[in-house]
From Swiss-Prot:
InterPro entries named in the record: MFAP1 (IPR033194), MFAP1_C (IPR009730)
Acidic residues biased stretches: 251-262
Cellular localization per UniProt: Nucleus
Phylogenetic placement of the source organism: Eukaryota, Fungi, Dikarya, Ascomycota, Saccharomycotina
Protein name, UniProt field: Pre-mRNA-splicing factor SPP381
Keywords: mRNA processing, mRNA splicing, Nucleus, Ribonucleoprotein, RNA-binding, Spliceosome
Length: 262
């Protein structure tokens, strides 16, 4: 404990000595300034020079300390490389075949197709614009002066209506005449042998005639009995042909039955 107390006293004594020396230097400086007054600029320059000298003295130490600290920090740091991200292929790209485009033929074909589509699109736009203009011009050219003379317009409409009906009637008539002419030509070209309908009629007529002949022949073979067939009239005799006359004249009259009387 005695040693520590002694050291403290020594330190206190040294501090007191330093303070006394500083006071002496300041008093001496004040005396010098009072004896040799200086300008503010000179004083500023002197203080700046002192500060530069102090920094020059401390410079190597500071640079050495900074270099040592940087070297130690560089040793502690670990170098990290920049990450590289790889793109994953899509499913549709995987399914597609690989393009061998050394000469760029596929790229050129795609470019030409795109240019062709663009050209077609522009042509369609131009065509639509021209069609719109033509439609607009037709709309503008429509005669909308119907209200100027309604009676005359009504009369003209009736005339147009009659003309339309006449044209339709004439068309129907021409069509009917054409059909009739075609039928006549077809009938003239066909013969009875070629026409199945006429052939069928001929067959029916032949069958009817054959049946009639068969009936007549059977009737001739079997004579009709007069007692049974009462409906068949008997043949008249010559004396029965003379009609009773109310006239007493015996002369024959010129009548339609005169040849019978003779």
């Amino acid at each position: 404990m005695a040693i520590r107390h002694f050291k403290k006293q020594v330190q206190e004594s040294s501090d007191s000595e330093n303070s006394s020396s500083d006071e002496k230097s300041t008093t001496a400086r004040d005396d010098n300034y009072s004896s040799n007054p200086m300008n503010e600029s000179e004083l500023h320059l002197s203080t700046k020079a002192n500060s530069d000298s102090d920094s020059g003295k401390d410079g190597p130490d500071s640079s050495s300390s900074s270099s040592s600290s940087s070297s130690s920090s560089s040793d502690d740091e670990v170098t990290l490389h920049k990450p590289v991200f790889l793109k994953r292929k899509r499913k549709d790209e995987q399914n597609q075949p690989e393009e061998t485009g050394e000469n760029g033929s596929l790229v050129r074909a795609a470019y030409l197709a795109k240019a062709l589509r663009q050209k077609q699109y522009t042509e369609n736009i131009v065509a639509s614009e021209t069609s719109d203009q033509s439609i607009l011009s037709q709309i503008i050219a429509i005669d909308d002066t119907d209200n100027t003379n309604p009676e005359q317009e009504q009369l003209q409409w009736e005339q147009r209506q009659q003309a339309r009906l006449k044209r339709e009637r004439q068309k129907k008539l021409d069509k009917q005449l054409l059909i009739e002419e075609q039928e006549m030509q077809r009938a003239s070209q066909l013969s009875k042998v070629d026409d199945p309908w006429l052939k069928e009629l001929d067959l029916n007529d032949d069958s009817n005639l054959n049946s009639f002949d068969l009936k007549a022949s059977s009737r001739n073979r079997h004579p009709v009995n007069s007692k049974k067939d009462i409906s068949i009239p008997a043949r008249l005799q010559k004396g029965q042909l003379q009609l009773a006359s109310s006239h007493t004249n015996n002369d024959t009259e010129d009548t339609e039955y005169g040849y019978i009387e003779e």
